[in-house]
């Protein structure tokens, strides 16, 4: 997980707020639906190993 930590510290240095989040399984199934949707939906990155990027 060191690569992930380095990437997160680089993002923090650029001023992107990164935090570890826990979300219910309902959100995971919604996320799959979003990926299957043809039109790109603009959302926060809330996808990367439970990290939230805003």
UniProtKB/Swiss-Prot annotation:
Summary of the knockout phenotype: Deletion of the gene causes a decrease in the overall Spx levels, as well as a change in the dynamics of Spx accumulation.
Induction: Induced under cell wall stress, but not disulfide stress, and this induction requires the CssRS two-component system, which responds to both secretion stress and cell wall antibiotics. Phosphorylated CssR acts as an anti-repressor by antagonizing YuxN repression.
Highest taxon listed in the record's lineage: Bacteria
UniProt-listed InterPro entries: SpxO-like
Function: Inhibitor of Spx proteolytic control. Acts by interacting with SpxH/YjbH, which disrupts interaction between SpxH and Spx, and inhibits SpxH-enhanced proteolysis of Spx by ClpXP. Required for the stabilization of Spx and activation of Spx-regulated genes in response to cell wall stress.
Subunit comment: Interacts with SpxH.
Name under which the protein is recorded: Anti-adapter protein SpxO
Gene (UniProt): spxO
